[in-house]
Amino acid sequence: MGKIKHIAIATQEPEKTAKFYKDVFGLEEVGQVSSDNAEGFYLSDGNINIAILRFKNEILVGEKFDTNYSGIHHIGFQVDDAEAADVKLRKADAFPMEEINSTLHAGMSRGRGGKNVELKYNGPDGVMIDISQTGWVGTEEE
């Protein structure tokens, strides 16, 4: 079975975006890129690599993003303490997406029927962030 090991996020501010993921989730910087095609950072939690890139080459960017965009919708992070993560997210200007969380009956604990609930936040560059203490279906709860 294939395993997810890499996610790339396009941004106009790679330093700011990388700082967000390092400060809030403790990801480590494992590399940098600066070329004619892109500049940015590679971050990791030891299991997955997240590329934070500002593309300089229109060919590499691919299709222009618009309302029909299909791509990364959100990234989920399993955290040890959802309340502590909430504090860090708010300090980094990432706030809960109240309408979505309300619709999903999301809160700081498990949802209806004991099922896991992820809290959604507005992350940098329009990428929605999920946090969960219990993980997701198909992942092991720590």
Give residue spans per PLM region.
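Vicinal oxygen chelate
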Residues: 86-142
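Hydrophobic side chains in well-ordered alpha-helices
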Residues: 17-20, 85-89
